[in-house]
């Protein structure tokens, strides 16, 4: 077994697979701004294993190499779908499972009909990423934060990579300390004029793609042309692109997106965060969308369930009090416990956050049940690759244990996967995805836990973790760029509910009634055993 250095310089053991992660990044130092300057209460919640220092892409060679292999996409679904990212570790050559539920980066980038690809992400490992492309691709536009793009090492460069690298256009985004260009978005254009959009939960590095569980939202094929009616998804996507205020994005990306007919996505909403001071985004924008769509839908005889599955939990909203973004701000806003944001005499939006005990009473009276899915220490122990995927999960609660104990012991908000329902190959491996969802059940009789979160009022799949950095608050703008897709029952035809299933056991819906959302964790989830379960925390293992 090898040993690795933790953030504070102490040593701990790591597995052989974790050693491979370290070898991949061993020549890259951590960003001094992000790691050394972050104060205790900074809400820096990067959910990624490392943040690399600024680098430049190396010069191209003139060598070329033809690829005879022709790769075809196998996704023929007419509507938007969720897929599980296939893993080189969990699904090996002998895998015979539900391949229709899975996708690879080769499926996304490797088709010979792909003409242009536009990528937004937080981390890029170029020698891994560019090998996923077919040689026929004409242009690859990469939008990334300075210091997060891993160049191709000289010893890894070959003729195939050199050919692809010549087609790359890099747009670098300068971000302030403790902020991230965290959006994960792919826009593909094909040689027949069609377009397709993907929202993966992973950044473009080998280990992040393969070690934690990852998912990908895939749009249907979109044609070039005009819509008969305005499409909110398109409008919000263009607003997001405009928020960069960069000529290269306007010329190379926005103009192309404007030519696409987004009518097939008319039932969905694009939800985003941007640090731009000129646009409303993040929590306030999401709240406004829900308010507009949810008007008149509340019922007094229902129990209301609100679930957040995340790979990172930010620090308390307040230094003086223990306040969590989900339990103390988002759910109270969504349910009307908290009054809508109002401006004071100085024009600033304000919100009065109730004390914890008052909120717990309100939740009880209004039949509101909050859930946060976050991996336990034991889930890593029982997962196939043990601690190897743990580097992508962050909740540094030892710095303020009262905050953690409030969530765990007072709200009893933490839930985990049901170990009896996980798959043999992936086991209790946690998911790096971020889902926010709401459903209602009849409160007159006993609640059937197996049916909770099968039919939803709404579901947001996003890159945004549970933090102020990603979402902002009522009075603060987000610091990150984030992107996601919102399903809402009021947008669906025939007043349907948003249907949800799990990849672990449920099969795809029949052709006439497909499921809208698929999640990489078990449904139902089960509550933490307060006598045994603790949230995973890296600091617990500093001296292992």
UniProtKB/Swiss-Prot annotation:
Native organism taxonomy: Eukaryota, Fungi, Dikarya, Ascomycota, Saccharomycotina
One GO biological process term: DNA repair
Signal peptide span: none
Miscellaneous section: Present with 2130 molecules/cell in log phase SD medium.
Keywords per UniProt: DNA damage, DNA repair, Exonuclease, Hydrolase, Nuclease, Nucleus, Repeat
Highest taxon, organism lineage: Eukaryota
Catalytic residues as annotated in Swiss-Prot or TrEMBL: 182 (nucleophile), 432 (proton donor/acceptor)
General function of this protein: DNA repair enzyme that can remove a variety of covalent adducts from DNA through hydrolysis of a 3'-phosphodiester bond, giving rise to DNA with a free 3' phosphate. Catalyzes the hydrolysis of dead-end complexes between DNA and the topoisomerase I active site tyrosine residue. Hydrolyzes 3'-phosphoglycolates on protruding 3' ends on DNA double-strand breaks due to DNA damage by radiation and free radicals. Also cleaves 5' phosphotyrosyl adducts resulting from dead-end complexes between DNA and the active site tyrosine of topoisomerase II. Contributes to DNA repair after radiation damage.
Mutagenesis or variant effect for residue 432 to N: Strongly reduced release of the covalent intermediate with DNA that is formed during the enzyme reaction, leading to the accumulation of toxic adducts. No effect on bleomycin sensitivity
GO terms under cellular component: mitochondrion; nucleus
Gene: TDP1
EC number, as in UniProt: 3.1.4.-
Protein name in UniProt: Tyrosyl-DNA phosphodiesterase 1
Chief localisation class: nucleus
CDD domains, per database record: PLDc_yTdp1_1, PLDc_yTdp1_2
Positions bound to substrate: 184, 434
TM spans (from-to): none
Enzyme class: hydrolase
GO molecular function: 3'-tyrosyl-DNA phosphodiesterase activity; 5'-tyrosyl-DNA phosphodiesterase activity; double-stranded DNA binding; exonuclease activity; single-stranded DNA binding
Region (Interaction with DNA): 312-316
Species of provenance: Saccharomyces cerevisiae (strain ATCC 204508 / S288c)
InterPro entries cross-referenced by the UniProt entry: Tdp1 (IPR010347)
Annotated SUPFAM superfamilies: Phospholipase D/nuclease
Localization of this protein: Nucleus
Family that this chain belongs to: Belongs to the tyrosyl-DNA phosphodiesterase family.
């Amino acid at each position: 077994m090898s040993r690795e250095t933790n953030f504070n310089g102490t040593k701990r053991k790591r597995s052989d697979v974790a050693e491979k992660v370290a070898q991949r990044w061993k020549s890259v130092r951590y960003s001094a701004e992000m790691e050394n300057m972050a104060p205790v209460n900074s809400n820096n919640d990067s959910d990624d294993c490392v943040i690399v220092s600024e680098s430049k892409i190396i010069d191209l060679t003139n060598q070329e190499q033809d690829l005879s292999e022709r790769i075809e996409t196998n996704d023929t679904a007419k509507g938007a779908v969720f897929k599980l990212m296939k893993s080189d570790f969990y699904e090996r050559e002998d895998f015979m499972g539900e391949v229709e539920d899975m996708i690879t980066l080769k499926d996304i980038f490797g088709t010979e009909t792909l003409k242009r690809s536009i990528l937004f992400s937080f981390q890029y490992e170029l020698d891994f990423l560019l090998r996923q492309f077919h040689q026929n691709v004409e242009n690859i536009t990469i939008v990334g934060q300075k210091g997060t793009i891993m160049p191709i090492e000289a010893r890894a460069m070959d003729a195939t990579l050199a050919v692809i690298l010549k087609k790359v256009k890099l747009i670098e985004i300068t971000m302030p300390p403790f902020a991230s260009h965290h959006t994960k978005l792919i826009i593909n254009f094909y040689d027949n004029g069609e377009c397709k959009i993907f929202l993966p939960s992973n950044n473009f590095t080998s280990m992040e793609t393969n070690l934690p569980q990852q998912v990908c939202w895939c749009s249907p094929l979109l044609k070039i042309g005009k819509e008969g009616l305005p499409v909110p998804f398109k409008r919000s996507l263009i607003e997001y692109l405009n928020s960069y205020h960069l000529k290269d994005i306007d010329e190379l990306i926005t103009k192309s997106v404007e030519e696409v007919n987004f009518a097939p996505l008319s039932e969905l909403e694009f939800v985003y965060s941007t640090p731009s001071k000129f646009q409303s985004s993040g929590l306030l924008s999401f709240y406004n969308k829900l308010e507009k769509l949810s008007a008149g839908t509340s019922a007094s005889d229902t129990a209301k369930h609100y679930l957040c599955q995340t790979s990172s939990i930010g620090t308390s909203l307040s230094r003086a009090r223990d306040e969590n973004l989900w339990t103390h701000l988002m759910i109270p806003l969504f349910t009307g416990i908290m009054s809508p944001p109002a401006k004071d005499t100085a024009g600033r939006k304000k919100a009065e956050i109730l004390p914890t005990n008052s909120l717990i009473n309100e939740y009880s009276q209004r039949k509101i049940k909050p859930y946060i899915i976050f991996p336990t220490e034991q889930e890593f122990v029982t997962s196939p690759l043990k601690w190897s995927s743990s580097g992508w999960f962050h909740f540094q609660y030892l710095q303020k244990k009262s905050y953690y104990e409030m969530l765990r012991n007072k709200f009893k908000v933490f839930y985990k996967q049901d170990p009896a329902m996980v798959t043999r190959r992936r086991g209790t491996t946690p998911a790096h995805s971020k889902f926010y969802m709401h459903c209602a059940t009849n409160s007159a009789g006993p609640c059937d836990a197996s049916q909770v979160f099968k039919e939803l009022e709404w579901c947001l799949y996003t890159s945004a973790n549970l933090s102020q950095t990603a979402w902002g608050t009522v009075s603060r703008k987000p610091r990150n760029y984030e992107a996601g897709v919102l399903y809402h029952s009021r947008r669906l035809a025939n007043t349907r509910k948003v249907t949800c299933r799990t990849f672990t056991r449920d099969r795809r819906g029949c052709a006439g009634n497909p499921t809208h959302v698929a999640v990489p964790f078990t449904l139902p989830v089960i509550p933490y055993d307060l006598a045994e379960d603790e949230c995973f925390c890296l600091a617990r293992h500093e001296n292992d």
